[in-house]
Amino acid sequence: MPDSTPPPPAGGPAAIRVTGLRQAFGRHTVLDGLDFAVARGEVFGLLGPNGAGKTSTINVLTTLVRPDGGTAEVAGFDVARKPGEVKRRIALTGQSAAVDDVLTGIENLTMLGRLSGLSGRTARIRAGELLDQFDLAAAGGRRVGTYSGGMRRRLDLALSFVVTPEVLFLDEPTTGLDTRSRRELWDVIRRLADAGTTVFLTTQYLEEADQLADRVAVLDGGRIVATGTAAALKSRIGGDTVELHDEHGELVREVPTDGTVSGLRRALDTLDEAGDHGVVSLRRPSLDDVFLALTGAGAQHRSPAADPAASVLEESR
């Protein structure tokens, strides 16, 4: 039988390869035949509302749960047949930081280094390097219980790099963070990707995927309904729109346009001929528009039906 899994994009062999992946909890199917591949060094974003199957996908790929059907390979090893080999090559960070509040930042890192087989001296050196890399050097001697949410999340990421992973899995890493902390964490993730780490990111923040991911897949009801670059997915739902808002900010009218100068002139002429008055703005398609078109609901406005796998991820941490 020929392999129907999409080939990885240009740039090298696949870091992750998934074919016909299925997962169910009782009679509830959460993953219904997923097919995708992620190239080495790529940032791949998996989008979807709560309950779409994002955490279930992470759980299978990180060997926390065996798949009920299909195959999945990570870093060249089958997650069901060679889970130990997979675990040695990956790191996982979830929605809450798995750090010890009583210890200082450098103590957290040094302890994990020792548990990972590093000598005391090497573990301390590595801890210092990671504090610098993740912008925590000034706080390294403080107890983690005094850290802000963003600092705790950065320390959690740093712990994943005590032994550098081939593939980093991030399950909604900025959930609960304020805007500033979220953007600071984005900067850290970008630096990791620029250094060559493969990043598999799940998120329901569409701006996050737009900012970070080389490619995105939209997951809905346990199935991938679209895959591509953010730009390619946006182009599927049409062009730009000229919007007219009244003095209260309410949308009065919108006119489609192709984004060219002549197209904009025609749109403005249409509004002028109709005698409409107000504030004009140009709106380009967003990933939120893509999500609405593909699933019928915005990612952050879906009913929060829990992914049954979420508890598995939290219990593992």
Residue map of PLM features:
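Conserved ABC ATPase "signature" region
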Residues: 110, 114, 121-139
